[in-house]
Each structure stands twice: as structure tokens, then as C-alpha cells.
């Protein structure tokens, strides 16, 4: 069967359109996966329009501050480095302190200019956060909104390796269920959030439970969000 030139022309045109759509979708996915944009918007609505964010390959973790027109340029080898650079700029150039209890700020309409390019780097490959006890002190009853703030705080301070225990209770429940333990036995063994640290360290004899079924589901869903956001930044979760 002969293929007409008109058919080939239309086929070629259709393929070009499909490729263009694919490239556009990839660009959109890339933009939406950039956590710095979301971080800036959470700090101050509209803040992302005041910065230029650039990634640049490097053998060491680094960030640079620069200026292009009326926009501040923050350059780094990964998103954690860039977030650290953002925190440095806000603190030492704009006079804005983002505290552990307050992660929002009113940025000036025109940001203070970076008059001279500035670079900072580190040879330390891992910056670790947290221990078991933290999860039963500060974090025991955090929701996603509070966890989102915490992950932002980690990135702003250069953390790239973090203990991530939320949802471990659900994993234990699922494993014990598959091994044939009853619901009552599991509930007597798995502790609540306020005691998780000591339970996981094997020094808890009992507690006043049990946990509701909805709590296990809630913890699992929360951990999925936590790990997803950590990986978007490039923070490695220690499970």
C-alpha cells in the first residue's frame, strides 16, 4: 500500500505537536517540582517573583548570591544549598530572621541588592537532624502544616539527612497483622505518639492506649507527605 505525501505531512505535523506538548508538560512538571518556589510563597506571598533561582553542578555543596536587575539571584548545586543561600540572604542582607516558631516575613517591595557576588561552600557531605526522642517531645502530634514548616526550616539551615520515624507504628501494625497477631495484641504492643521514641528504643513496658484505627491511617499518609517533600528538596530520609 502506497503512503501519500499528504499523509506523511500530516503525520509529521501531528508528531511535532505531540513532542511540543510533551516538552511543555516536562517543563511544567519541572517547575512544579521546584520546592524553592513554594518555600518563598510560604515565607511571603509573591516572594518567588523577586528572586531568580539557578542550579549549577558542583563537586561540593555551595550557594552563591548575585544580582540581575532588580532581582536577587540565588545559585546552588541543589535545592538544599539554594534554600540555605536564601536564608543567608534574608538574614545578612535583608535583616530578616526566620525563627523555628515563625517562618513568615514581610519582604520589602524592592529587595536589598547584592552589590558583590558572594559564594559559600562546604566540604561536609552530610548535615544530620534529630534523634528518636525528638519525635515524642516536639513532634508527637504535628500535622502536615507543621511538618511542612519543619522541612522548610531544615532546608533553610542546610540539613540534607534527617531521621524520619512518622508512620513506623503503621508498619509494625501491618507486619504483626500478617504474622497472625490479633488486634488486641497489636494495640497492647504499639504505643501512641507521645511514647513512640521509647517504644522504638525497646524500653517501654506499656502504656494506656489503644490507638484508634484511623490514627494508623493518618500516620501513614502523613509520612508519605513528609518523605515526598524531603525528597523534593534533596533531604535524604533515614527510615
Where in this protein do the model-derived segments appear?
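Positively charged n-region of N-terminal signal peptides that target proteins for export
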Residues: 2-3, 12-18
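Aromatic (phenylalanine/tyrosine) cluster motif
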Residues: 7-9
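Prokaryotic Sec-type signal peptides and long signal-anchor helices
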Residues: 11-13, 26, 193
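Boundary at the C-terminal end of the N-terminal hydrophobic targeting segment
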Residues: 31-33
Amino acid at each position: 500500500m502506497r503512503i501519500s505525501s499528504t499523509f506523511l505531512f500530516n503525520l509529521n505535523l501531528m508528531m511535532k505537536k505531540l513532542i511540543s506538548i510533551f516538552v511543555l508538560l516536562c517543563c511544567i512538571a519541572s517547575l512544579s517540582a521546584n520546592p524553592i518556589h513554594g518555600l518563598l510563597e510560604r515565607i511571603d506571598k509573591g516572594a518567588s517573583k523577586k528572586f531568580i533561582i539557578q542550579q549549577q553542578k558542583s563537586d561540593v555543596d555551595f550557594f552563591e548570591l548575585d544580582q540581575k536587575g532588580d532581582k536577587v539571584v540565588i545559585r546552588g548545586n541543589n535545592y538544599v544549598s539554594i534554600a540555605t543561600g536564601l536564608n543567608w540572604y534574608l538574614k545578612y542582607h535583608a535583616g530578616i530572621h526566620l525563627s523555628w516558631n515563625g517562618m513568615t516575613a514581610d519582604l520589602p517591595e524592592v529587595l536589598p541588592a547584592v552589590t558583590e557576588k558572594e559564594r559559600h561552600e562546604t566540604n561536609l557531605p552530610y548535615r544530620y537532624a534529630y534523634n528518636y526522642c525528638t519525635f515524642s517531645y516536639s513532634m508527637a502530634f504535628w500535622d502536615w502544616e507543621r511538618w511542612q514548616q519543619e522541612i522548610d526550616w531544615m532546608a533553610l539551615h542546610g540539613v540534607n539527612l534527617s531521621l524520619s520515624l512518622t508512620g513506623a507504628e503503621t508498619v509494625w501494625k501491618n507486619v504483626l497483622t500478617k504474622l497472625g497477631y490479633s488486634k488486641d495484641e497489636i494495640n497492647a504492643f504499639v504505643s501512641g505518639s507521645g511514647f513512640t521514641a521509647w517504644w522504638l528504643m525497646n524500653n517501654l513496658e506499656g502504656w494506656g492506649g489503644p490507638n484508634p484505627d484511623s490514627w494508623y491511617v493518618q500516620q501513614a499518609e502523613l509520612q508519605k507527605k513528609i518523605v515526598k517533600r524531603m525528597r523534593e528538596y534533596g533531604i535524604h530520609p533515614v527510615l
